[in-house]
């Protein structure tokens, strides 16, 4: 479920998904998928909101969260944004990025009201050290940016996507699934991150 599940109030529909996944039976099977069956999980936009509310990113398991844990909150402009964003693959630790290289830049559509990644300095340092910062918003030169023209929601350290410690759970705001022939005109950079092809490749 996405869009405006639960009315998108008082926060994004990730809360709706997270509530479902906290059902003990479902939580048990999700943890089993990740810990015992070498599974993958991907959350895009509302899915990322759910993963971070559950603790699946950045911790790799469903857990109770603390007040200072990373979160996604309202965009700095205070409203929904729908735009093309330039994002750089910062780490290829995740199997979801098996078909691209660190440093590759893509143009990816974003559409959300609550996509601003927030975390304290120590948490960001730890994520960077572990290679868990998967993707970042960048300018036309490929550099992470705090400029609202490029970092559209105002995310800390321009972070667009993060992973679990082992990389098998990926959460990101950009809609990597919105790709196809002749969808975008006069937009620089590649559009296809080959995330889904990489996911299939993982199980072959």
Residue ranges of predicted features:
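A broad, low-specificity signal for short, low-complexity segments enriched in glycine/proline
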Residues: 1-4, 45, 67-71, 119-125, ...
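Glycine-rich His-Gly loop
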Residues: 1-6, 46, 113, 174
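C-terminal and late-domain segments of enzyme folds
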Residues: 89-204
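Cysteine-nucleophile active-site neighborhood
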Residues: 5-95
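Amphipathic repeat-derived elements
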Residues: 1-14, 132-140
């Amino acid at each position: 479920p996405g869009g405006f599940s639960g009315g998108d109030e008082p926060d994004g529909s990730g809360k709706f998904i997270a509530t479902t996944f906290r059902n003990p039976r479902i939580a048990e099977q999700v943890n089993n998928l990740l810990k015992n069956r070498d599974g993958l999980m991907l959350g895009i936009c509302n899915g990322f909101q759910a993963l971070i509310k559950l603790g699946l990113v950045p911790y790799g398991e469903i857990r109770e969260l603390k007040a200072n844990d990373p979160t996604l909150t309202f965009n700095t402009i205070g409203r929904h944004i729908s735009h093309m964003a330039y994002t750089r693959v910062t780490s290829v630790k995740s199997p979801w990025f098996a078909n691209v290289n660190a440093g590759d830049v893509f143009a990816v559509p974003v559409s959300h009201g609550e996509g601003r990644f927030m975390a304290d300095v120590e948490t960001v340092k730890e994520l960077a050290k572990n290679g868990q910062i998967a993707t970042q918003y960048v300018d036309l030169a490929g550099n992470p940016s705090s400029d609202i023209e490029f970092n559209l929601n105002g995310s800390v350290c321009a972070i667009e996507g993060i992973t679990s410690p082992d990389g098998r759970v990926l959460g990101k705001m950009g809609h990597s699934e919105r790709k196809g022939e002749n969808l975008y005109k006069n937009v620089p950079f590649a559009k296809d991150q080959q995330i889904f092809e990489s996911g299939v490749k993982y199980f072959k």
